From Swiss-Prot:
The lineage of its organism: Eukaryota, Viridiplantae, Streptophyta, Embryophyta, Tracheophyta. Keywords: Membrane, Mitochondrion, Mitochondrion inner membrane, Transmembrane, Transmembrane helix. GO terms for cellular component: mitochondrial inner membrane. Probable component of the PAM complex at least composed of a mitochondrial HSP70 protein, TIMM44 and TIMM14. The complex interacts with the TIMM23 component of the TIM17:23 complex. PANTHER family: MITOCHONDRIAL IMPORT INNER MEMBRANE TRANSLOCASE SUBUNIT TIM14-2, PTHR12763. It comes from Arabidopsis thaliana (Mouse-ear cress). The chain crosses the membrane at residues 7-25. This is Mitochondrial import inner membrane translocase subunit TIM14-2. Component of the PAM complex, a complex required for the translocation of transit peptide-containing proteins from the inner membrane into the mitochondrial matrix in an ATP-dependent manner.
Amino acid sequence: MVAAIIAGAAVAAAAYAGKYGIEAWQAFKLRPVRPRMRKFYEGGFQATMNRREAALILGVRESVAAEKVKEAHRRVMVANHPDAGGSHYLASKINEAKDMMLGKTKNSGSAF
């Protein structure tokens, strides 16, 4: 007799848990979708780097102070340095972007 009561209580508890689980899942699916990551630039590199592309690479505005360019260059290079497993190509593009933003380039294009 006691076993039947315990079994009935267990079945009722499982039914209520299932009901609330389904309701929670439906509420979760109905919530508005929020982007989990920032939207990144989907295009590739241009043949000749311009100021806009340099600003996109460094993550700064086109009309930014030299100090901010240097800070952004350091931040991006730490994340993409070849000695830390980054790409030599990306490192060269990052350096080219810094030179472009600081006005140290003759706009001759990339070495690659």
